[in-house]
Amino acid sequence: MRCPNCNSLDTQVKDSRPTEDSSVIRRRRVCIACNFRFTTFERVQLRELIVIKRNGRRVPFDRDKLMRSVQISLRKRPVDPERVEQMVSAIVRELESGGEAEISSETIGESVMDHLRKLDDVAYVRFASVYRNFREAKDFEAVLGELSHEDEARAALVRK
């Protein structure tokens, strides 16, 4: 592992431990050349995914880009970062285990929206507004109407 401080390849692992859901290994490292300490995270990659963009271009799947877009939708929301990490890991696992090496950006977007809907309504609406390219207030009203209808249906089930 290359040191982010001095670019030396001579680093040493001082501590390794799994995260809470055991999907990632956290490693504390130290650079032998400059004594800089840093942390790395390792996760299993089941397959190399290719994303088919709306314009037809094919690009490598970028987990960090997915995480950034989810974090933007969750900005200033009271959601534990560990739950966000678990959600993104679950989305990636679903995509990797889907059997296809190439997946559409629409498939990814729909998966993110499904997971965000369960995690935080505000983040779901924020993500949907960008993903579905909302242009007018009625676009927001339609999504909010869907959410309130789902809430009413859930409440009716609880009362039974």
Curated annotation (Swiss-Prot):
Molecular function GO terms recorded: ATP binding; DNA binding; zinc ion binding
* Keyword terms: ATP-binding, DNA-binding, Metal-binding, Nucleotide-binding, Repressor, Transcription, Transcription regulation, Zinc, Zinc-finger
Q: What InterPro entries would the database entry show?
A: ATP-cone_dom, NrdR-like_N, RNR_NrdR-like
Superkingdom is: Bacteria
Point to the regions of Polar residues compositional bias.
1-11
**Cofactor(s) for this UniProt protein:** Zn(2+)
Q: Which PROSITE patterns match?
A: ATP_CONE
Query: Which N-terminal stretch is annotated as signal sequence?
Result: none
Chain positions of all zinc fingers (unnamed):
3-34
Q: Where is this region: Disordered?
A: 1-20
Q: Which Pfam families match?
A: ATP-cone, Zn_ribbon_NrdR
The answer to keyword Ribonucleoprotein applying to this record is no
Q: Which residues form the ATP-cone domain?
A: 49-139
Single GO biological process annotation from the record: negative regulation of DNA-templated transcription
* Co-factor remark: Binds 1 zinc ion.
Similarity-based family: Belongs to the NrdR family.
Concerning NCBIfam families, the annotation shows: transcriptional regulator NrdR
Q: What does this protein do?
A: Negatively regulates transcription of bacterial ribonucleotide reductase nrd genes and operons by binding to NrdR-boxes.
Q: What is this protein called?
A: Transcriptional repressor NrdR
